[in-house]
Protein backbone atom coordinates (compact mmCIF):
# COMPACT_ATOMS: atom_id res chain seq x y z
CA UNK A 1 0.00 0.00 0.00
CA UNK A 2 2.89 2.38 0.68
CA UNK A 3 4.09 1.86 -2.89
CA UNK A 4 0.68 2.99 -4.13
CA UNK A 5 0.60 6.03 -1.82
CA UNK A 6 4.10 7.04 -2.89
CA UNK A 7 3.10 6.72 -6.55
CA UNK A 8 0.00 8.81 -5.91
CA UNK A 9 2.16 11.51 -4.27
CA UNK A 10 4.60 11.40 -7.22
CA UNK A 11 1.73 11.83 -9.66
CA UNK A 12 0.44 14.89 -7.81
CA UNK A 13 3.99 16.30 -7.74
CA UNK A 14 4.47 15.71 -11.46
CA UNK A 15 1.08 17.27 -12.14
CA UNK A 16 2.34 20.42 -10.45
CA UNK A 17 5.48 20.40 -12.60
CA UNK A 18 7.82 18.80 -10.05
CA UNK A 19 8.60 15.28 -11.27
CA UNK A 20 10.53 13.03 -8.90
CA UNK A 21 12.00 9.60 -9.63
CA UNK A 22 10.50 6.64 -7.81
CA UNK A 23 13.66 5.71 -5.86
CA UNK A 24 14.11 9.30 -4.66
CA UNK A 25 10.40 9.48 -3.77
CA UNK A 26 10.64 6.29 -1.71
CA UNK A 27 13.64 7.69 0.16
CA UNK A 28 11.96 11.06 0.81
CA UNK A 29 8.62 9.47 1.80
CA UNK A 30 10.21 6.89 4.12
CA UNK A 31 12.45 9.34 5.96
CA UNK A 32 9.70 11.98 6.20
CA UNK A 33 7.29 9.46 7.68
CA UNK A 34 9.64 8.97 10.61
CA UNK A 35 8.38 12.40 11.69
CA UNK A 36 5.05 10.86 12.70
CA UNK A 37 6.72 9.57 15.86
CA UNK A 38 7.60 13.10 16.97
CA UNK A 39 4.81 14.77 18.98
CA UNK A 40 2.83 17.25 16.93
CA UNK A 41 2.12 15.12 13.84
CA UNK A 42 2.98 17.97 11.45
CA UNK A 43 6.66 17.13 11.20
CA UNK A 44 6.12 14.59 8.42
CA UNK A 45 4.73 17.19 6.02
CA UNK A 46 7.50 19.67 6.85
CA UNK A 47 10.16 16.99 6.47
CA UNK A 48 8.63 15.96 3.17
CA UNK A 49 8.99 19.52 1.87
CA UNK A 50 12.59 19.86 3.06
CA UNK A 51 13.70 16.46 1.77
CA UNK A 52 11.95 16.95 -1.57
CA UNK A 53 13.64 20.33 -1.96
CA UNK A 54 16.99 18.56 -1.56
CA UNK A 55 15.97 16.40 -4.52
CA UNK A 56 15.30 19.50 -6.62
CA UNK A 57 11.52 19.52 -6.15
CA UNK A 58 9.55 22.50 -4.88
CA UNK A 59 9.01 22.12 -1.15
CA UNK A 60 5.65 23.87 -1.45
CA UNK A 61 4.55 21.43 -4.16
CA UNK A 62 5.78 18.47 -2.10
CA UNK A 63 3.93 19.58 1.02
CA UNK A 64 0.84 20.54 -0.99
CA UNK A 65 0.82 17.17 -2.76
CA UNK A 66 1.13 15.44 0.62
CA UNK A 67 -1.79 17.39 2.09
CA UNK A 68 -3.94 16.89 -1.02
CA UNK A 69 -3.00 13.20 -1.10
CA UNK A 70 -4.03 12.84 2.54
CA UNK A 71 -7.39 14.47 1.85
CA UNK A 72 -7.95 12.24 -1.17
CA UNK A 73 -6.97 9.21 0.92
CA UNK A 74 -9.42 10.09 3.69
CA UNK A 75 -12.22 10.65 1.21
CA UNK A 76 -11.46 7.42 -0.62
CA UNK A 77 -11.47 5.60 2.72
CA UNK A 78 -14.93 6.97 3.52
CA UNK A 79 -16.05 5.95 0.05
CA UNK A 80 -14.81 2.38 0.50
CA UNK A 81 -16.47 2.28 3.94
CA UNK A 82 -19.78 3.41 2.49
CA UNK A 83 -19.63 0.93 -0.38
CA UNK A 84 -18.55 -2.03 1.74
CA UNK A 85 -20.04 -1.38 5.15
CA UNK A 86 -23.26 0.57 4.93
CA UNK A 87 -25.46 -2.41 5.80
CA UNK A 88 -23.37 -3.14 8.89
CA UNK A 89 -23.51 0.50 9.96
CA UNK A 90 -27.28 0.44 9.56
CA UNK A 91 -27.53 -2.45 12.03
CA UNK A 92 -25.96 -0.35 14.78
CA UNK A 93 -27.73 2.90 14.05
CA UNK A 94 -29.94 3.38 10.99
CA UNK A 95 -28.80 6.98 10.54
CA UNK A 96 -25.14 5.84 10.23
CA UNK A 97 -25.96 4.14 6.95
CA UNK A 98 -27.48 7.34 5.59
CA UNK A 99 -24.59 9.44 6.94
CA UNK A 100 -21.99 7.14 5.34
CA UNK A 101 -23.72 7.34 1.98
CA UNK A 102 -24.04 11.13 2.27
CA UNK A 103 -20.34 11.52 3.08
CA UNK A 104 -19.45 9.29 0.13
CA UNK A 105 -21.65 11.28 -2.24
CA UNK A 106 -20.05 14.51 -0.98
CA UNK A 107 -16.60 13.03 -1.59
CA UNK A 108 -17.46 11.96 -5.14
CA UNK A 109 -18.98 15.36 -5.93
CA UNK A 110 -15.99 17.07 -4.32
CA UNK A 111 -13.53 14.98 -6.33
CA UNK A 112 -15.39 15.78 -9.54
CA UNK A 113 -15.42 19.50 -8.63
CA UNK A 114 -11.82 19.57 -7.40
CA UNK A 115 -10.26 20.51 -10.76
CA UNK A 116 -12.38 23.69 -10.77
CA UNK A 117 -12.12 24.47 -7.06
CA UNK A 118 -8.45 23.73 -6.39
CA UNK A 119 -6.71 26.47 -8.44
CA UNK A 120 -8.50 29.44 -6.80
CA UNK A 121 -8.17 27.89 -3.34
CA UNK A 122 -4.43 27.32 -3.83
CA UNK A 123 -3.98 30.86 -5.17
CA UNK A 124 -5.77 32.30 -2.14
CA UNK A 125 -3.71 30.21 0.31
CA UNK A 126 -0.48 31.17 -1.47
CA UNK A 127 -1.35 34.89 -1.26
CA UNK A 128 -2.36 34.52 2.39
CA UNK A 129 0.93 32.77 3.23
CA UNK A 130 3.00 35.09 1.02
CA UNK A 131 4.45 32.23 -1.03
CA UNK A 132 4.41 31.29 -4.69
CA UNK A 133 1.66 28.90 -5.70
CA UNK A 134 2.12 25.91 -7.98
CA UNK A 135 3.41 26.75 -11.45
CA UNK A 136 0.66 24.82 -13.16
CA UNK A 137 -2.79 23.39 -12.57
CA UNK A 138 -3.15 19.69 -11.78
CA UNK A 139 -4.57 17.75 -14.73
CA UNK A 140 -8.04 16.33 -14.11
CA UNK A 141 -6.90 12.79 -14.93
CA UNK A 142 -4.11 13.02 -12.36
CA UNK A 143 -6.54 13.94 -9.59
CA UNK A 144 -8.94 11.15 -10.46
CA UNK A 145 -6.21 8.54 -10.93
CA UNK A 146 -4.66 9.55 -7.60
CA UNK A 147 -8.07 9.13 -5.98
CA UNK A 148 -8.47 5.68 -7.57
CA UNK A 149 -5.02 4.65 -6.33
CA UNK A 150 -5.94 5.76 -2.81
CA UNK A 151 -9.21 3.79 -2.98
CA UNK A 152 -7.30 0.73 -4.17
CA UNK A 153 -4.89 1.11 -1.25
CA UNK A 154 -7.87 1.01 1.15
CA UNK A 155 -9.12 -2.17 -0.53
CA UNK A 156 -5.64 -3.66 -0.05
CA UNK A 157 -5.66 -2.63 3.63
CA UNK A 158 -9.00 -4.41 4.02
CA UNK A 159 -7.76 -7.56 2.28
CA UNK A 160 -4.61 -7.60 4.42
CA UNK A 161 -6.66 -7.17 7.59
CA UNK A 162 -9.03 -9.95 6.51
CA UNK A 163 -6.05 -12.25 5.87
CA UNK A 164 -4.62 -11.37 9.29
CA UNK A 165 -7.95 -12.03 11.01
CA UNK A 166 -8.34 -15.33 9.22
CA UNK A 167 -4.78 -16.33 10.09
CA UNK A 168 -4.93 -15.58 13.82
CA UNK A 169 -8.47 -16.61 14.70
CA UNK A 170 -9.60 -20.20 14.97
CA UNK A 171 -11.85 -21.44 12.23
CA UNK A 172 -15.46 -21.65 13.31
CA UNK A 173 -17.26 -24.78 12.28
CA UNK A 174 -21.00 -25.10 11.87
Locate each region found by the language model.
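Mid-bilayer segments of alpha-helical transmembrane spans in multi-pass integral membrane proteins
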Residues: 33-42, 70-82
Amino acid sequence: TYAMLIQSWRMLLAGWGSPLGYAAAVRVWTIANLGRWIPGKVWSVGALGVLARREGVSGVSAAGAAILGTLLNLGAGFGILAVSGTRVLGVFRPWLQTAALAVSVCFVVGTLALPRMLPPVLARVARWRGIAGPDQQLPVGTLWLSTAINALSWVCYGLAFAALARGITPQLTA
